[in-house]
């Protein structure tokens, strides 16, 4: 019988003391996605992530070494040499760096001379005015009228790649664009498109980046039509590269959210990179705050998100996805409030999401309060404030604003410290529809689980 005796308060307290709450830094480290993201990014795209991480790392030397290892095989010779000096506490650099710098400058001169004629022609308005959408006809025109050869066209590709390796991303974007206008080599054109996308990202030219995202997407669908594995790999890369404009350029938000939820891409996320659910969840939650957002579209995105988070919970979870699960799958408001606190720590330590942290917390509080108000007739302001992570005064202001902004039928009893919700009675017909919807949704989830 002794085994069935519940633990004493002292035992519970000592157990809690043995497992104190994690600090913000511990939570951030536990859910750091950098090791998962790096394999899907070009080394130049990894660099901004390392720069961001170095701001929160105590071991500067280790981070400098990581940057050195990342960039030592590029042609950013001066920057790499400076990193070497920092690592080795030296004012001088080995001869190999001097030699490599001379080689890089010589190659730049070579590529510049090799491509000088064709780049000059492509800057001539009269020549460009005679170009058409037919690449074969363009090459024939340039060959007959100006002596342009296939090698000259290919030199644009080589020069663009070299400029990219040197960190001259603006020059690289222009050269790769010029190459793509003329080349009929599909593999090189595809490579140039990826290179131009990276260059647009690294120069924060978000309009240009989104144009390249669409071009890469189209290339994946057409060039790799008969190669499902190749499509999966390329879609995985595109998803990761798209994170840069996703949270830095507002017009990209809707386009990329729709892309990620499309059958081919949500399947890629579930199969290859489930950690992207963090970014999809953050995008959907913060979409709630956007005044121009269509309510029906938002509700559909939220339903799709809940479905995927429910399905993939065994494969991937973090405080952001756990918040969605707690609120919309388990209807556990205490757990949702706890996960929201952890989610804020994760967001502020994530390169892509740090700027969205405040918007996420604001939107999440709205979602908690909306869900809570839907299932309660009388709400204690103090209790709801606690669930939102606010003190009573802040909570009261929050609820007043919520009632005003959402125009819900409710009134505040300041004397009792409660909110009284006026839920209109639902017709029997409507109740049957809602229950049927719920049963159908559960059937879909079970079917998907069985199919896996």
Curated annotation (Swiss-Prot):
Full protein name: Eukaryotic translation initiation factor 3 subunit E
GO biological process, one term: formation of cytoplasmic translation initiation complex
Superkingdom of the source species: Eukaryota
Source organism of this protein record: Aspergillus niger (strain ATCC MYA-4892 / CBS 513.88 / FGSC A1513)
Record HAMAP family: eIF3e (MF_03004)
Domain PCI: from-to ranges: 257-426
UniProt xrefs under InterPro entries: eIF3e, eIF3e_N, PCI_dom, WH_DNA-bd_sf
Family membership noted in the UniProt record: Belongs to the eIF-3 subunit E family.
Ion transport among keywords: no
Alphabetized UniProt keyword annotations: Cytoplasm, Initiation factor, Protein biosynthesis
Compartment annotation: Cytoplasm
Predominant cellular place of this UniProt entry's protein: cytoplasm
SMART domains: eIF3_N, PINT
Alphabetical list of Gene3D superfamilies matching this protein: 1.25.40.570
Gene Ontology, cellular component aspect: eukaryotic 43S preinitiation complex; eukaryotic 48S preinitiation complex; eukaryotic translation initiation factor 3 complex, eIF3e
Function (record text): Component of the eukaryotic translation initiation factor 3 (eIF-3) complex, which is involved in protein synthesis of a specialized repertoire of mRNAs and, together with other initiation factors, stimulates binding of mRNA and methionyl-tRNAi to the 40S ribosome. The eIF-3 complex specifically targets and initiates translation of a subset of mRNAs involved in cell proliferation.
Coiled coil: none
Subunit structure, interactors included: Component of the eukaryotic translation initiation factor 3 (eIF-3) complex.
GO function term, MF aspect, one: translation initiation factor activity
PANTHER family: EUKARYOTIC TRANSLATION INITIATION FACTOR 3 SUBUNIT E
